Amino acid sequence: MNTADPRKRFPRSARVRTRAEYSTVFNGARRVSDPLMTLHWLPADRPARLGLAVSRKVDPHAVGRNRIKRVLRDALRQTRTDMQPGDFVVVARSAARNASNDDIRQAFLRLLRRLRALPTPGVDGTMPPPDGIATPSLTEPAPRSGTAEPAR
């Protein structure tokens, strides 16, 4: 039995399933590409759903095609709560056959960020300091400590 966090599962409602749904996404979606895959996104009012197209041209062996799909489903499962709503369809390219699982995952996340469907991660050190901690001013010179003002 799957005891994973229910918010991290990949339920039927999170999938693009029918030919009509795929056609709607392909005909009206924004598209971005990468050497490993193409991502189509059709914004909608419902939570993010994922469709996968991994043909035999990508990998003639079912094991390889299933690995690519498994990695992409897992990436969606981990990031679904942060994603913009809508339908996403990934069309894998033949370069994905030789890519590592991490390369496939990173390519998927990179494409989501390019579509602005996933927020970009913050860089360490970019957060403002907590209240009560003085920060140097960029517009005023720093006060000199230990020197008295000149007499007039």
From Swiss-Prot:
Its EC number is 3.1.26.5. Keywords: Endonuclease, Hydrolase, Nuclease, RNA-binding, tRNA processing. GO terms for molecular function: 3'-tRNA processing endoribonuclease activity; ribonuclease P activity; tRNA binding. GO terms for cellular component: ribonuclease P complex. InterPro entries: Ribosomal_Su5_D2-typ_SF, Ribsml_uS5_D2-typ_fold_subgr, RNase_P, RNase_P_CS. GO terms for biological process: tRNA 5'-leader removal. SUPFAM superfamilies: Ribosomal protein S5 domain 2-like. Residues 119-152 are annotated as: Disordered. Belongs to the RnpA family. NCBIfam families: rnpA. RNaseP catalyzes the removal of the 5'-leader sequence from pre-tRNA to produce the mature 5'-terminus. It can also cleave other RNA substrates such as 4.5S RNA. The protein component plays an auxiliary but essential role in vivo by binding to the 5'-leader sequence and broadening the substrate specificity of the ribozyme. This is Ribonuclease P protein component. It comes from Stenotrophomonas maltophilia (strain R551-3). The gene is rnpA.
